Curated annotation (Swiss-Prot):
Residues annotated to bind Mn(2+): 156, 158, 227
UniProt-listed InterPro entries: DXP_reductoisomerase (IPR003821), DXP_reductoisomerase_C (IPR013644), DXP_reductoisomerase_N (IPR013512), DXPR_C (IPR026877), DXPR_C_sf (IPR036169), NAD(P)-bd_dom_sf (IPR036291)
Protein name: 1-deoxy-D-xylulose 5-phosphate reductoisomerase
Originating species: Gluconobacter oxydans (strain 621H)
Chemical reaction(s) catalysed: 2-C-methyl-D-erythritol 4-phosphate + NADP(+) = 1-deoxy-D-xylulose 5-phosphate + NADPH + H(+)
Length: 408
């Protein structure tokens, strides 16, 4: 006989990328269920003050900051709290490897690959918000998940919507899936207007509030391209079974077309706490403060096909998904370099797609990526190819020396 007064076991939680946009939304939800959780680790990038505030709020066991130059500031902020601190790349990986029942993997870019893999190898639930883990290292990640018996829970609103819309049905019943896109700030812009677009204009997303990198990705539709590749990995689908629809209201987040003709969708307000809460409470549901959707207030929902001429990254993403091998890793790496260059006014907005295309065209081979070292090698290679293109465009690198620069 069990004691009815016994308290349920607290779930052990780790948040990788707690100071980013997904991470802060996650912390907000965790702070609402303090009696149900035990926060093992919070990992941030360079914002020591925010990381310390989060660690105190959640009474975390350890706070880890990637930027080693901010470690002293973090220690000062947490002095006398009993919360341990650590810093640097290896400390971030070790935080990912800590035994936890649920890990939020929200470190963006290639920097998130190693800690996300470490979390998957624990064999528990990983809420995946790091696109690169599946885009660049899909085979490596899925193999680690399978070998450890882990559960991969998609956080991206579109993939989470697909998972909810499937409702437990097997993929043989699925004809295709449809990912939605807001269209970003340039949905109605001409090529000439997009060519002249500034970072300030590109950062004004019409419906979502996100970090700078993902906001620019949304504006270029590189984000949707990455999501097409990620969806193929997550759901085991070929490129021709993944459609994209532009839906400016951002109310419908994803749809599943079943072979019997049924079309099932997931809808909700544009608040990332909704998909995060779904992964946190899965297979149950939790109460959230998110705004409830009032469909009558919208009156009308719009859908249109994306323009893959103006939004070249989406077209290129489909090409690399069909090509396989190292191409997706090069696409992702080149996009990161291009977005950074655009934000720093080194290239124009359309230069993002041009840089990705140039990096892909410059690949002299396209091998399968079987290990993390393979992935990291081609990530670095993609960055070098992209940077070489940007330098050539600005007159800073001659064609005859570019290969030496890439192989340095």
């Amino acid at each position: 006989m069990t004691d009815g007064s016994a308290r349920p076991t607290r779930r052990r939680i780790t948040v990788l990328g707690s100071t980013g946009s997904i991470g802060t939304s996650t912390v907000d939800l965790l702070a609402r269920i303090p009696d149900e959780i035990e926060v093992r680790a919070l990992v941030g990038g360079c914002n020591a003050a925010l990381l310390a505030e989060q660690a105190r709020r959640l009474n975390a066991e350890v706070a880890v900051i990637h930027d080693e130059s901010r470690h002293e500031e973090l220690k000062t902020c947490l002095a006398g709290t009993g919360i341990r601190t650590a810093a640097g790349r290896q400390a971030v990986i070790e935080a990912g490897a800590m035994e936890a029942d649920w890990t939020m993997a929200a470190i963006t870019g290639a920097a998130g690959l190693e800690p996300t893999l470490a979390a998957a190898r624990n064999g528990h639930a990983v809420a995946l918000a790091n696109k690169e883990a599946l885009v660049c290292a899909g085979d490596v990640m899925l193999r680690a998940v399978a070998e450890a018996g882990a559960t991969l829970l998609p956080v991206d609103s579109e993939h989470n919507a697909i998972a909810q819309s499937l409702g437990g049905c097997d993929m043989e019943s699925v004809e295709k899936i449809i990912l939605t896109a807001s269209g970003g700030p340039f949905r109605k812009s001409s090529i000439e207007e997009m060519r002249a677009a500034t970072p300030e204009k590109a950062l004004k997303h019409p419906t979502w509030t996100m970090g700078a990198k993902i906001t620019i990705d949304s504006a270029s539709m590189a984000n949707k391209g990455l999501e097409v590749i990620e969806a193929a990995r997550l759901f085991g689908l070929t490129e021709d079974r993944i459609d994209v629809l532009v839906h400016p209201q951002s109310v419908v987040h994803g749809l599943v077309q079943f072979r019997d003709g049924s079309l099932v969708s997931q809808m909700g307000s544009a608040d990332m706490r909704i998909p995060i809460a779904h992964t946190l409470a899965w297979p149950k549901r939790m109460v959230t403060p998110c705004e409830r959707l009032d469909l009558a207030a919208y009156g009308r929902l719009e859908f249109e096909a994306p323009d893959e001429v103006r939004f070249a990254p989406l077209r290129l993403a489909r090409q690399v998904l069909r090509a396989g091998g190292a191409a997706p890793a090069v696409f992702s790496a080149a996009n990161e370099v291009a977005v950074d260059a655009f934000l720093n006014r080194r290239i124009g907005f359309l230069g993002i797609g041009e840089t990705i295309d140039a990096a892909l065209q410059a690949m002299d081979e396209n091998p399968e990526l079987r290990t993390l070292d393979d992935v990291l090698h081609w990530d670095a290679r993609g960055r070098a190819l992209a940077e070489a293109h940007i330098l050539r465009q600005s007159g800073g690198l001659r064609n005859d020396v570019s290969e030496n620069a890439l192989n340095a």
